Amino acid sequence: MVCIPCIVIPVLLWIFKKFLEPYIYPVVSRIWPRKAVQQLDNKNTGKVDCKGADTNGFSTKGPTEVSDKKKD
C-alpha cells in the first residue's frame, strides 16, 4: 500500500506546474531581483582534479568489471 503523501504531493505539484505556474511566474519574475542570476563567480570554472580519485565507487587502478559467476 502506498502512503497518501506519495500520491497527493505529485498530483499537487502537477496541478501547480500545469495550471498555477503560468499565472504566478510572470508576476514573480517582475518582482524577483535579477542580480542573483547575473552575478557569476568564475574562480573555479574549469578547474577539476580527479587524478587518483574514486568515481562512482570504482578505483582508477585494477579491474572494473564484475563477474556474475559463482566461485566454489
From Swiss-Prot:
One Gene Ontology cellular component: endoplasmic reticulum
Any one Pfam family match given in the protein's UniProt record, by short name: DUF4512
Keywords: Endoplasmic reticulum, Lipid droplet
Location in the cell: Endoplasmic reticulum; Lipid droplet
Keyword check for Endoplasmic reticulum: yes
Bilayer-spanning residue ranges: none
Principal location listed in the UniProt entry: endoplasmic reticulum
Region (Necessary for its localzation to the endoplasmic reticulum and lipid droplets): 1-33
Subunit relationships: Interacts with DERL1 and AMFR.
Family membership noted in the UniProt record: Belongs to the UPF0729 family.
UniProt name for this protein: UPF0729 protein C18orf32 homolog
Organism for this UniProt entry: Rattus norvegicus
